[in-house]
Design a protein with these regions (language model features):
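C-terminal, non-catalytic "cap/extension" segments appended to globular domains
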Residues: 1-133
Length: 133
């Protein structure tokens, strides 16, 4: 949705008919969609939750939260694979508690994430968890 949303809202000429919006949506889908939705899909005309009420950009915070969550959980998966235990690895849990939970809002969230994972978040774990990689 983000690319479509940015392209739609960066146009300098007003859109005068719905077919132009659907054509833009199809252009974006052709470029980035892993799976093409059915041709009858009219998402821009029906998904008012994201496109109305000033909420549009804030909606993407949900996907960002999924990226952080999946990447953090991947640390537990990696420990389980390395140690042959379950994902309830004590050492990884301790690092998570200290870097994320104990720090709370005392520092920027990215600093806490980096303290836990040793790097910035990536999308690989999310793609894997959602069956896309």
């Amino acid at each position: 949705f983000s690319l479509f949303d940015m392209l739609l809202h960066s146009q300098t000429e007003p859109v005068t008919h719905g077919d132009a919006i659907l054509a833009l949506q199809q252009q974006v889908r052709d470029e980035v969609a892993v799976l093409q939705p059915p041709a009858y899909s009219r998402t821009p005309h029906t998904f008012s939750h994201i496109f109305a009420g000033g909420y549009s950009a804030g909606y993407y915070s949900y996907k960002w939260a999924e990226v952080l969550s999946a990447d953090a959980y991947a640390a537990f998966e990696e420990a389980a694979q390395k140690n042959g235990h379950s994902t309830l690895d004590v050492e990884t849990g301790r690092r998570y508690r200290e870097a994320i939970l104990e720090a709370g809002g005392s520092r920027p969230a990215m600093a806490s994430f980096k303290a836990f994972r040793g790097r910035e978040p990536g999308i690989d774990a999310l793609l894997r968890h959602q069956g896309m990689a």
